Amino acid sequence: MPITSKYTDEQVEKILAEVALVLEKHAASPELTLMIAGNIATNVLNQRVAASQRKLIAEKFAQALMSSLETPKTH
């Protein structure tokens, strides 16, 4: 079942494009990009989510990340 979002694809894509431009400007490697993304997620959880909800939301975030990864097709 697809997950519905309260945010439009346009909103998400616009912000994603702006972030991508900043990372490109700084020639951020994939490793640095993932480190930055992880730090952003950690900061959001620690600063904007109630302590009682952090673990649950982090687990849901991790599950969503894992489910969004493309798996290589085997023949």
UniProtKB/Swiss-Prot annotation:
SUPFAM superfamilies: YejL-like
A Pfam family per the record: DUF1414
Domain of life: Bacteria
Record InterPro entries: UPF0352, YejL_sf
Family named by the database record: Belongs to the UPF0352 family.
NCBIfam families on file: PRK13689.1
UniProt name for this protein: UPF0352 protein VP2129
